[in-house]
Every structure is written in C-alpha cells, then in structure tokens.
Amino acid sequence: MRILRHIFALAAFLLPFIASAQFYVTGDDPGRLKWYSIETDNFKVIYPEGTDSLARVYAEKIERFRIPVSLTTGYLSGQGDGRKMPVVMHAYNAANGSVAWAPKRMDLFTLPSAYDPEPMPWSTMLSVHESRHVTQMQFGLTERQKPGKWFLGEGWNIVTF
C-alpha cells in the first residue's frame, strides 16, 4: 500500500510536465492583449487590439472567397449548423493557419514570412487556403453523418475528415 501511495504521488507530480494544454500552439499571444470582434454574415473575426484594419481585410477576404472555395467541395462554410465560424487572428506569431473542429474555429497567423515570398498577398493565400479546410470539414455536418455526431459531438468531424 505504501508503494502504491508513492507511485501515485510521483505520477501526480510528473503529470503537469507531460500534459499538454488545449491551446498549446495558439496560446502564445501576450496575456496583456485585449480582444475585439467583427461579425460578417458568416464569420466572427476575433482579433487583438491594434489590428482592426487587418481584421477587416481578413473578414472581407474570407467572406469574398466563401462561395468560390465551396464550389470545389460542394459545402459552404457555416452550412449545416447555422452558427458563424469563429476566426481567431494571431498577429504576433509565425505565418500559418489552422482549422480545428473541437471547439470549432479557424486560427490565422497573420505575420507573413520574410523568407518565403508568395506570388499573391499573404492575406489572400491564407484566407483561401484555410477556407478550403473549413469547407472540407463541413462533410461531417451532413444529414448522413448526424448519428455519428450524436455520439462523438464535434469530434466526429475528425473521424470523417
């Protein structure tokens, strides 16, 4: 019994070192930031203070490319659940983006890379690319897939994607 107690104490001590937080990749924004939002017809863009003009650019681009991107997959972003897609802008990180479905959101890392020049503006490339991932994940919200969502929630999209 004493050995079991020591093993439990050691495991409780080591667990924080091996555990990963939910927002590990995107949680490195400075804690002092104040966050604001802009709502479009289909998206809610959440952005840090001081980047409102950049947020308007991204909001306009993801809204503008919503239908052209959906023509290649057959699904519109926001189709199926009727909620606006949260788009979280991270203006102080690297150049990248990601789409997660549990919780549902699109993360945009808006700082363009100085070492990887693109033929199109970074805001356009990022908006189109991440919008494509959103429409691909809409497949899990179709009528045929709803029973799976009853059991696994938003995690069902991960299984079907």
Where does each model-flagged region fall?
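Absolute protein N-terminus
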Residues: M1, A21-Q22
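Bacterial N-terminal signal peptides that target proteins for export
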Residues: M1-A11
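Short, flexible, solvent-exposed loop/turn segments with mixed acidic/basic and small polar residues
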Residues: L4, L14, Y75-L76
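Juxtacatalytic substrate-recognition/specificity segment
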Residues: F23-F161
